[in-house]
């Protein structure tokens, strides 16, 4: 397929630009079109200068574990934080991590430092930045319960430090106004026993492996749980377990997970999700909200 890219005049940066990047290789679903430009900043200051000096649309991608990139073009610039933003520092019961850090690595570092309260991160695929963006949570814990502060670049290219209260968290979202790129976060846990923390983490991993299609090409939880309900139960009762459109299928193991069973397009996945929403709404009068995020344009 031929894509008509715009020859953008990009700001000078210390990091790197790549043009015409095929996004399907970067997503857990293994679907998606082409990004016009991907930018990897070399530092927070480099990122801030880029934001100040461009008027192009900006989107941010981590490891794309809870993201469907549509089949067409992702316009503008996709910011991808690299290894310069993957670090962990522990001090007592406080732990700071760059936003490209994997959540599983954060959980392990906390355990090794005897910091409890962050065990739930071990079962969540994704990065610290993605978790901050959507108030990720599992097994009774979430970002809002352990976050102390987050450093971010706002849409004006200013580097800001935001408190937990500033984030105005609610279920699977924050309440910030405007566009933000999170660069690192500081969490507070409690002093705990390393062996006990490791035991809890092993339990969470076992529960995840037993209940979720961890070996499939999936993107994590598809829909938010409506108040008073479990999304998977509504989906199951609406007759959607195993439902398939094209190469996309509702997981037989956990109904709130979609799978790329081979050859699926982003449109297959989105159409399947919308079919689920229609069936659940028709049967229960409940509108399921996407937890998975979308990026880019369809064909």
UniProtKB/Swiss-Prot annotation:
Give any single GO term for biological process. Answer: regulation of cell shape
Q: Just give the chief location class.
A: cytoplasm
Q: Can you say where in the cell this protein is located?
A: Cytoplasm
Identify the cofactor(s): FAD
Q: Kind of enzyme, top EC level?
A: oxidoreductase
Q: Which reaction does it catalyse?
A: UDP-N-acetyl-alpha-D-muramate + NADP(+) = UDP-N-acetyl-3-O-(1-carboxyvinyl)-alpha-D-glucosamine + NADPH + H(+)
* Keyword flag Phosphoprotein: no
Which GO terms of the molecular function aspect are on file? FAD binding; UDP-N-acetylmuramate dehydrogenase activity
> Hey, which pathway is this one from?
Cell wall biogenesis; peptidoglycan biosynthesis
**GO CC annotation terms, alphabetical:** cytosol
Name the EC number(s): 1.3.1.98
Domain FAD-binding PCMH-type: from-to ranges = 31-192
* UniProt record similarity statement: Belongs to the MurB family.
Biological role: Cell wall formation.
In Swiss-Prot or TrEMBL terms, this protein is called UDP-N-acetylenolpyruvoylglucosamine reductase
Q: Which gene encodes it?
A: murB
